[in-house]
Amino acid sequence: TTDNTINIGGVTVQGEGNMSGVKIEPVAIANNKPVVNVPLPDLNRTIKITANMDENAKKIATAKIQDLSSQLKKDSDNLENWLVLGVYRKTIGDYESAREVWEYASAIRPKNSVSFNNLGELYAYYLKDNAKAEENYTKAIENGPSAIYIYRNFFDFYRYFMKDTAKAKAILEKGITANPATSSDLKNLLKSLQ
């Protein structure tokens, strides 16, 4: 291969081959962070608990949601706080808020696996949208191929929601291939399908 240099819009790019697929796109930056094209979830949203919880659990969840929301108003780039806020919103039965929070987390950190796994579960178990569940589980595995628990969750989705044993088996095999030394749980599940 030969080294090539091309100039695209005043930017010099070096690479190998004919570089016909090279593309440069502008990225909007504000406060040294890429601008996300997803609206910030409403951090002042009313806390409405619809889940069956005892009073103490309700108080704890409410306090955690208020605290996390307050922290996120100061630093909306904190992935961990978005992930935990989504968990608390889901716990109280506010699935739409959990979805918004995890979609935002996925937008600000498109290479993380946790928010996509959480969305997969949310869409499968609570929002009853199998296409969105599959899409998010697929992205979670793409982003976190060594996270065994995601393969397990995706397997459960295929087996119990989609009733598709072939896809359930295929996702286990994919996880085993990607993680030969750490996939004993997946191997046992695969044996149970035989």
What do these predicted ranges mean?
Residues 84, 118, 153-154, 188-189:
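Canonical tetratricopeptide repeat
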Residues 78, 87, 112, 121-122, 147, 156-157, 182-183, 192:
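Residue-level recognition of tetratricopeptide repeat
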Residues 74-75, 108-109, 143-144, 178-179:
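Structural marker of alpha-solenoid helical repeat scaffolds
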Residues 102, 169-175, 183-194:
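Extracytoplasmic/luminal low-complexity segments enriched in Pro/Gly and acidic/polar residues
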Residues 1-73:
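Long, contiguous interaction/recruitment modules in multidomain scaffold/adaptor proteins
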Residues 57-70, 92-104, 127-139, 162-174:
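Structural signature of tandem alpha-helical TPR/SEL1-like repeats
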